Swiss-Prot record:
PANTHER family on file: CENTROSOMAL PROTEIN OF 131 KDA
Organism per entry: Drosophila melanogaster (Fruit fly)
Phenotype of null mutants: Displays reduced climbing ability and die very soon after eclosion. Loss of protein expression leads to truncated sensory cilia formation and impaired intraflagellar transport processes. Simultaneous knockout of Cby and dila results in lack of motor coordination and absence of cilia in chordotonal neurons where centrioles fail to build a transition zone and Cep290 and Mks1 are mis-localized.
Classification via InterPro entries: CEP131 (IPR030465)
Protein's UniProt name: Centrosomal protein of 131 kDa
Tissue: Expressed in chordotonal (Ch) neuronal precursors. Expressed in ciliated cells, like sensory neurons and spermatids.
Family: Belongs to the CEP131 family.
Main location: cytoplasm
Protein purpose: Cilium-specific protein with a role in cilium/flagellum formation. May be involved in transport of components into the growing cilium. In germ cells and sensory neurons, plays a role with Cby in the building of the transition zone necessary for the formation of the ciliary cap and for the correct elongation of the axoneme.
Amino acid sequence: MDLCLKGSQINLATRQKTKPKYTSRSLTTLHNPCPHFRPRSANFLQQRSRSSPFLGRPQSADPKFGRRLSNYFVEKELRNGGKRQVSSNDLLKSLLEEPIKRSWLCRSTCNSSESDYSLHKRTPDSSEEGEQFLVNMPVGEKVKSYSSYSGNQGLSNGALLQRTAKPDLPGRVSFSKPNMHADLDSSDCDNDKQEVRPSISAPGPLTLPSFLSKVEQADPVGQKKSVHFGSTAAEGEVLAETYEYPKCPSENCTCSTRSSSTTSTNEASASDVKCACDAPSCRFMESSKQVEPTSPTPTLPKAPSSELDVIREYKQAVEGVQVVKNHLGTDTLNNIEILPNYLDKYASPTKEKQNNLSETKNMATNSSAVNNGSVVYRPVGNPRNFGAENNFLPAVQDDRRSFANGSSDGVINNYLKVASTPPFVGKKKENVKPASADPIARSSKSKVTKSTINPAPLGKMKKAISVGSLREERKLSEYNLDKVDSWMSMQDQKQYDGKHKPGLEDLDEAQDNDTASQLSLKSNEDSRDSTYDEIVSVIKEIEEDKKRDNFSEGIPSELNLNLDSRCETADTVTVSEGKVPESGDKYKDILAYLNNVESSCDKTLMETRRSIPDSNRSEVEFVVEPDVTDEVPKLSELLMLPNHQLARRVIALSLRANELANAIHMSKEHVFQLRGEKQKSLRAEKSTAAAKLRDQKKHYEEVVTRHQGFIEQLLKDKGSLCEKVAALTRRLESQNQAWEHRLETELARTKETTMAGEKIRRERWVRENTKKIKELTVKGLEAEINKMNCDHQREVTELKRTHQMQLLDALEEARTKHEQIETSIRESCAQDREAIIEKERTAIRERFERQLEEEQRTQAEQRQKLTEEFAAERDRLQSELRQRENEHQARRQEALREQEQELEQAKFEMQERMAKQEEKYQNRVNTIEQQYQADFELWKTEHENKTKLAQAEKENAIRQHYRAERDRQLDELVVRMEADALQHKEEHELKMNRLKEKYEKDLVLAESVEKSLREKYAETRGKLAEADAQVRNSQAEVKQLQLELSHSKKMCGDIIMERDRLRDNLNADIQSELGVLNERHKQEMDQLQKRVHQTIQRQEETIEILKGDNDALRQQCLKLNAVIRQQRKDYCVK
């Protein structure tokens, strides 16, 4: 099952990657888990900046400052508590709420494939060769990971053609096939690079022009193959001579670069393409030496562990297959040139013993162009060409095939095998239409099939081996069990078999017909005037009947169709379309694969129906076939003949009787020989099928154990990752707690220091102001106080401005720093989360596949058991159900009667009881309501009187207290002012006297200095005017900058709020999309499971139908054989 098929790309290299450890965290995110809100200090200062700038006292002088600050932080915490979002920490916790508990310990498995397979025997045919892929792998700049590769890989033309096989990987199951590297695309060189061939050339192997390598052709003499047919009575032989293409001498050779995927790909660049047999005659061995890649393939460095080797192989294989599909296109398999064959008239008297018989099968559809040649047979003693004069034998492959399929061929051939004539030597020649004659044939395919026939002793007639015996006598190694990856491969094997196996059957049947025809010619040379004309007329009639019957029939295909060939046909359809699916659309790939499997089932049924010949003649017609009695002479005619004519006729009839007796004897021997060969072939087929089943079972068990090793390793990795994640979350929580504790202590310390500083400044301000008030007089008290208030307000605003700028700078620095840390933490958590989700998904997929296989196995076992139990249980339950129904009906009637009586009595009692309770409840409610109204009126009047008296008393006491305090302070102040005024008056008088004397002395000096000062004053006045103008300009600029600053602050606040809102929306959208994706994935997996069950059921039904058709055909063949035997007996008797 191709689940992903590319779906199991697990990057184990991420386990080796070190994860960053963060020792610092944002103070804002520690106090508030939501990362999208501004720090509280910024909001607090923004709120404070909105207050009035003309306060009379500092804000710390307010005794409610501390309480308001604490209340602000509490309200901010409560207000942000409802808007908290899930952090990366909480997201990891939610992902790993229920980790998978594993009882085993985390142990290091350096080589899981070898340790898991150590309990099983490994055959030489099971995955011993290394997988060879030519991949240019670029190395990353930051992380040297082998999990991703570039799509622009440099591949040579030879490497592109050698890498069409899919690898064996943990996520996909596939069959391998023999490599088709010989089918090169030569369509580009048809016009200018094609060789000039002669019109008629000597027969022999015709090879395609190779554009990749220069292959020397072998000696034609060594490739000439002939088959000798002898007779039992004479020493003569029939020589059928042909030529064959060279075949790899090794039985296990598939000439394929395909091998198992268990070994590392480090050997791929060195070994390149090489045949497994190392034979000098193998065409792949010669061609592989000439192919040179356009770019050198770098060798991969050694990975730290075998798991990385396995994943690296997988990635290389997947990328390589995609690159090959992109380079090959859609018309690679359709542009193969047809092998041209020419008719050569030659004669060779040599008699060589050869073992191989080959035939080139042309699949061109133009039948008129094919029927141009004829098969010529030349006897030794007579130069006449009997076959050419009388149209004795069919000359075309289609006619020969139709002739071999006739129902009466065996009867005629058995009567013609007479060995009493001199030896006859003939040659079998081929006549096939050249490839250049028909333009349509240039886009079709031509295959070459090879069959081996063991040599027979001299002097005895040897029968050509049929395709059934060839298939039964094939060794198990020829099935390429070491190349089998799994049971659902999609290759071209079915198409290959459908084109070549009918060719083998046609070849064998044509060989039998040719042998029979040659023997008939040898036996009838002396008696051509009597028997020869009758035989020729019978053969002509049979040919005409067969042409009418089999005109609409196609080429018959094999009836023994298996599951892997149908799957390969489906893959051929997908490859010819040339569509390379992306690695992301795995679900669509799986559905397309299932559709191809179902279409292959339907196509197989249709081909089987078409391949079954629908004979127009029934068995009854064969039995009741009328005898030819028109030529039997009458008795009166015989009596009128002379004696010498009667004697001559008696001699002819005696010779005819001898011929028929010899034919009957040879037919019996042939029947015995066929029976023995059939029994031997059946036994060999059973033994080979059992051996193949054992080997396949062994191979599949090894594949399952290897996949189980992968799954166990992934589970161990998941367990270690879960432990690391848990440790990381614990460490983050401890760091969170430490930072929160530190933040609380720092806040408390700063609060205490600010409160102490404000208290000291307030006391200093109070002392300075009291001192100034004492120095002032009563008259200038109000003006001085207003001045002091203005100065204090100006100082307060300057301090606020400086403090605000300092705080904003510090907060901006902290914000940038914390945002950087936050983004780095978020990125690392997102990467870890993606890696964990990917590994979880792969582990779930693997576990689902294993559970699906187990359920399929247990379903078949439980089905039979459950059906039996269900039948028994159904009978027992039906009997019990009838008894219970009868009892239940009786009980039900009694219960209904009792229930009706009890219900009427209960209704009556309940009505009485409800009436009494309602009256009692109404009385009680009325009394309670009246009592409540009276109590409430009394309490209301008392409470109003009490509150009024208490309020009046409090107001009087407060009014009297503040009046007395005001009078006392005013008296003290007046007394203090009067004493200060007297003292200041005395001091002023003394000071005035001293200064008067001093000023009189200085007046003279001042007048002299006055002139110079006036000049300086004029200059200073000009400078002052300039300074005033500059001050006004500066003030205007300051106002403009303040307006711009307020506008910028407002815009910044709006932008921050918009950013927070967008983050919230994006997070909500991501969560909703994740939920939708999870639901869609679950639905797809359910649909996929149902579809897989339907496909498997469809395949089982197809196999059953094909088995039924095969059995019906076998029965029909037996019946036809019985009819033919009966006809032989009747004919011999007559």
